[in-house]
């Protein structure tokens, strides 16, 4: 028996898998390096929001057929997403068709924001024309106005001159929003790092490598600081107009500066679409910010991918530690839960949206 055991052991040793050995000269790309965490802690994945949601930042094709709308609403139900704000409403006939289709089929579940017509901006009567169209769009069911990032960054008139965010030809349109008490959700610029040198010190190096067209060199674009200066000039010019600063104004990584701006502009709010990665790496600072400004921050997601909402819920609702974000190019770091108090969570998820966006049926939400 002892001899048999001695014979088996060498065979067993020979059967062991052979692993690569460490090599100080080995090279691996940033994309390939994806280590599995050796940390074992409690995990509390969340696939459905604790309270009904109003997602104030989404984009959907307004002409989708009934079957596609039914599928969309079913997916929303799974997330506890009660109201989706479609920011891609357009203007004129397109806006009316989008409202008639989406709200006609599901009156309580969708909100449509209008967009402006940027054609013929050189025309002497453009300011009046665009304001009148917006007024008609609101009468046709638009519940807000959305500006995309091209406004200010690369929108130009025929002469080639850049249209600035605080260009006075748009003043009347912003005042129309004040008149009808509908908010303006405005997306200005992009992450600050897209405007900075693409080098080893740039925290968005990987994203710019994968998407070089997102880089904003100074010889082709205004600086990030210039664009933000124009944005806050615009917000300050219209104190009776309610603004929602998209993507936390790209200040998710500098909540101290965002705090100063919220203090300075009482008509400004902010939403969290596409900046969760910044919040999840500073949970204590973010929790304090969300608590202090609990009446000023709204929930938004931007890209419609249901599984990505789970990470938002987990960051906002749990105290989990060191878990993955869903897109490496945004965050090669781990997330930590903010564990927001229930009252703060309710305001983020739906109460602020109910207060700021007119016409949402409040009976769909708890008190």
Model-derived features: positions:
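Active-site neighborhood of phospho(di)ester-bond hydrolases with catalytic His/Asp-centered motifs
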Residues: 54-56, 85-88, 113-115, 146, ...
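Sec-dependent N-terminal signal peptides
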Residues: 4-13
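H/E-rich (His + Asp/Glu) clusters that bind or coordinate divalent metals
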Residues: 216-234, 238-367
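Histidine-centered catalytic micro-motifs
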Residues: 53-62, 185-189, 245-249
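Divalent metal-dependent hydrolysis catalytic cores, especially in the metallo-beta-lactamase
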Residues: 53-59, 71-93, 110-117, 143-144, ...
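Active-site gating/metal-coordination segments in enzymes
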Residues: 19-29, 41, 95-214, 266
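Acidic-and-aromatic substrate-binding clefts and catalytic sites of carbohydrate-active enzymes
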Residues: 60-68, 86-96, 119-128, 155, ...
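Mature N-terminal segment immediately following signal peptide/propeptide cleavage
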Residues: 39-70, 74, 350
